Amino acid sequence: FMNNGNTFDWNQQTFPKLLQKVGYQTAIYGKSHLRGNPKGFDDWAVLPGQGLYYNPDMIFPDGKRRIDGYCTDVVTDLAVDWLKSKRKGDKPFMLMVQHKAPHRNWMPALRHLDLYADQDLPEPPTLFDKWKDNAPPARNQELEIDRHMDLNYDLFVDLTPEYNQPASQKRQDRSAWHNMKRMTEEQLKAWRAAYGPRDAAFHKAELKGKDLVRWKFQRYAKNYLRCVKGVDESLGRLQKTLKELKLDDNTVVIYCSDQGFYIGDHGWYDKRWMYDESLKMPFVIKWPGVTKSGSRDKHLVQNLDYAETFLEMAGAPIPEDMQGKSLVPLLKGESPKDWRKGIYYHYYEYPSVHMVPRHYGIRTSRYKLMKFYQFDEWEFYDLKKDPDELTNLYGDKAQEKNIKRT
């Protein structure tokens, strides 16, 4: 995928198909974000595109239908039902539970709207970063909390189904506003009861400058964490179900995502850059009897390693044309001498949403080298001494050997 919206070929080889060949029952519920109906799954129900947070449409093998409720709960219900009533007890299984949350514009469950309302979250140390030492592209994007975050469409200030006003930027995400049109009167009433008084207090304060940025950050970060709370509850329900079915000691549970995110870091929101806040992503695993509880691994891994990992866990053959590396040795506490020393990243979408320019680069355990090739601009960081990537060392003669080595 070089651009968002490219079509996925479901006829090609995939790890779910390979697991089916060795006897696994497979299922997927939730976000697929790949055009076309899933293949390689014995049962499935997926959201159209990004889907909606409230009362989402779901596509089933027999067609599309609306399911009332909050999306995270809906997806979890489908997964729990599959485990309890559709799973074949005589077969191993692979279940993918893929949530919309916390994709922006994030809309929390009604039960979480008051979460964190009585406290201030700690600000990232780079909230007011002005990218003075970065290459020029960092100063010419459209993802600043200060200048680009939309009060209405991003933060729901005074947002109603009838709002429909011009956005602050051409490519503004209006998904939350579109979702409001699907909410029931009861849901809207609860939503307005929570946000109405906060919006009134915001207007009364007439905030400007850094105070306004701080308010935006608090509103944004809290809504993010409220959505994550729903995902956390989902994981808890799934773990509880596995325990009830006496499967918890023989099931590998993996939590991961597709990228990191800026929540005020460097004064930004959204993702796309190669800086660590968006480059890094969570990968948490419970492998009973194999992976030591509470252990951490510092090897460089990528999501292209997942397929080989799952296949090796299942005892399935790994095709030679797969490009990742199985994580099984790392999960067993081993340190392979031939493990990769660096990873490659490439962002293609420009001009596009948030106007982050095209760039590629290499990250090792200590250094990062990036090139914005449309503008012939480079950046180089020592991540040990400068984990926030504030001091661009490209052009520093003392770093020439490190740059060449990277």
Regions found by a protein language model. Name each.
Residues F1-Y373, E377-W378, P387-R405:
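Formylglycine-dependent sulfatase
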Residues K384:
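Residues forming the ATP-binding cleft of Hanks-type serine/threonine protein kinase domains
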